[in-house]
Curated annotation (Swiss-Prot):
Residues that coordinate or bind NADP(+): 48
Keywords associated with the record: Amino-acid biosynthesis, Aromatic amino acid biosynthesis, FAD, Flavoprotein, FMN, Lyase, NADP
Protein name: Chorismate synthase
Lyase is among the record's keywords: yes
Amino acid sequence: MAGNSIGQHFRVMTFGESHGIALGCIVDGCPPGLEITEADLQIDLDRRRPGTSLYTTQRREADEVKILSGVFEGKTTGTSIGLLIENTDQRSTDYSDIKDKFRPGHADYTYHQKYGIRDYRGGGRSSARETAMRVAAGAIAKKYLKQEFGVEIRAYLSQMGDVCIDKVDWNEIENNAFFCPDADKVAAFDQLIRDLKKEGDSIGAKIQVVATNLPVGLGEPVFDRLDADIAHALMSINAVKGVEIGDGFDVVQQKGSQHRDPLTPNGFRSNHAGGILGGISTGQDIVASIALKPTSSITVPGDTITRTGEPTQLITKGRHDPCVGIRAVPIAEAMLAIVLMDHLLRHRGQNFAVQTETPKI
């Protein structure tokens, strides 16, 4: 099975399944000398961790990360960093009914057809449980970016169902279980989740992720454009069905005179491009949004087939998120951090001595 790693200079490879013994990852390319502890990684893992509120899955995993290698006396050594999280709250019997059935809207059918075998317990490798290791690796990247370059990466829930935020208060995001920057919308999100639980249904969501204080020049045209790699990373998150950079699909309705971001000696007048032009960072905020589909793990009966092709119905048992978008906020931050870390190291390796007569705005 290929496709388990991302990045070139800063490379992350994950392994493990939803109901396996443990999850793990290897982080290659982290520069030496970065002060890092398990407690540093645990901060973001706790933000993603299941069972922390009434609004997410009640599977209770501590998600306590262990650093196995690559760190000595509290600092990275420049060698491979090994990370491990043990699974402790598996209830595999919840999935015995789907051993020979395919859950509609999930990867059961495609994994079975591709590999001829699948781990049906919680979706196995296709489960969002795998993203715990992305968050752990992303926490390393986030700390390096912030400490060495002042880059900060933050995300928030901007829409759930038909409820959209009206304002962004960065100080409000960590004050509620939804990572919502608009305190006036928290009650509406709360009621929506409660209604969905009664119905046994789920809902989609939109998340915006922003990186600030980024230097100009990151990105490797043409196939490794910064926005292309960001889209690739964000699209790899479970349930993501759409990615926008800057104004995204709204550009369809814009004229060129509206969309272009005029340059002045004091900076850009706007940021419709989301901080990227020609696949290279402008030094403005990197702004991206992702759309996440509603999970198909619901108690509303759905039509499907058995392994032998017989028609049947399925009601999904187990513990699931009524909106997967809530816990995807720290995952989106992690994936953006991994991409930016990789591109920053690539840029530094090739272009560190480049100087121009044009001032950076």
